[in-house]
């Protein structure tokens, strides 16, 4: 812009100079032609010199023309001088502006270089972050595989008729096991109670032994039943929804000791109806199985959140740098 401005000023000065010089030359040419014509007239007609008045008039007219020409030349020179002074005064201002703009351009170049360096560092950081994220993903997949190959036994219930068949099989398998557990517990309590409370009688009194033992067995059975009902009321079945199995639900029930399995969310209503329809068999010692906690889940979640936050910060920083560059 400033180079064009200086070029325009120079061109205007040249045009003014050439126009004024051409005017001066034209005025000199006119005077020269007039003088030449008069000189030719005087040489052609030398006899016509009778009137001195005419000669005086011619000389006066020539002097007048010369004075007018000189005045025109002076005015043109004054105009040229004023215009040249204006140009001379404008040139340092133009130089100052060009210096200022050159400094601003240098500052912008330095900023652009700094921004390019920052962009290079940010790209390197992003690439390193991508590599770290890939490594974390690999670790997460390895941990998921380790968790999948753990000792948890999952019982999958498919859709349709197979689900009903599997529930019936479970009912058949669980019911005899619960009955065996209850009978074994009652037998153990009876055997433990007999040597303590029953006195030793001779072999001939078998009928009396039966009579004396039967009320004790009845009281033990009643106590066992009451304790089992209390424990059953305290230890209710728990339902755990695991984050690793998004569509599977782990059910832990107290019926017949320890037994747990995983059930699909779509088959949960059918399973609840089956549980309500089956007879209630109270166990001897109910046990509530707590949820297994994986120690790597919290660490993985924290690492992923940190990586995502760092990636968002770097992306925001790059966007701000781009906005600054576009503004500049």
UniProtKB/Swiss-Prot annotation:
Basic and acidic residues compositional bias, start-end: 186-197
The UniProt keyword set, sorted, is: Coiled coil, Phosphoprotein
Q: Which domain of life is it from?
A: Eukaryota
Annotated region (Disordered) at 186-205
Q: Where does the record place the modification Phosphothreonine?
A: 182
Q: Which residues form a coiled coil?
A: 122-151
Database matches in InterPro entries: Ccdc54
Annotated signal peptide: none
User: Which parts of the chain span the membrane according to its record?
Assistant: none
Q: Know the name of this protein?
A: Coiled-coil domain-containing protein 54
């Amino acid at each position: 812009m400033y180079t064009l401005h200086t070029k325009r000023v120079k061109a205007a000065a040249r045009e003014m100079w050439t126009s004024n010089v051409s005017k001066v030359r034209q005025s000199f040419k006119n005077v020269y032609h007039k003088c030449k014509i008069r000189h030719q007239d005087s040489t052609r007609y030398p006899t016509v010199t009778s009137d001195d008045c005419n000669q005086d008039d011619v000389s006066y007219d020539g002097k007048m023309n010369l004075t007018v020409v000189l005045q025109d030349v002076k005015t043109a020179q004054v105009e040229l001088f004023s215009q040249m002074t204006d140009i001379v005064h404008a040139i340092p201002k133009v130089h100052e502006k060009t210096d200022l703009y050159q400094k601003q351009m240098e500052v912008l170049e330095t900023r652009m270089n700094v921004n390019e360096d920052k962009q290079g560092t940010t790209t390197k950081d992003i690439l390193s972050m991508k590599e770290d994220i890939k490594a974390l993903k690999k670790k997460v997949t390895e941990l998921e595989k380790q968790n999948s190959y753990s000792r948890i036994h999952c019982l999958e219930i498919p859709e349709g008729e197979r689900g009903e068949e599997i529930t019936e099989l479970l009912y058949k398998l669980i019911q005899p096991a619960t009955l065996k557990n209850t009978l074994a517990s009652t037998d153990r309590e009876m055997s433990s109670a007999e040597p303590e409370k029953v006195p030793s009688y001779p072999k001939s009194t078998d009928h009396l032994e039966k009579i004396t033992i039967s009320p004790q067995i009845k009281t033990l059975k009643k106590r066992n039943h009451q304790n089992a009902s209390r424990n059953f009321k305290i230890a209710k079945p728990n339902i755990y929804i695991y984050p690793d199995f998004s569509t599977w639900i782990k059910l832990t029930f107290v019926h017949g000791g320890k037994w747990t399995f995983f059930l699909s969310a779509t088959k949960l209503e059918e399973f609840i109806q089956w549980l309500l329809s089956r007879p209630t068999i109270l166990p001897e010692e109910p046990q509530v199985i707590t949820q297994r906690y994986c120690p790597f889940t919290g660490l993985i979640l924290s690492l992923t959140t940190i990586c995502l936050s760092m990636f968002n910060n770097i992306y925001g920083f790059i966007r701000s740098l781009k906005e600054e560059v576009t503004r500049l």
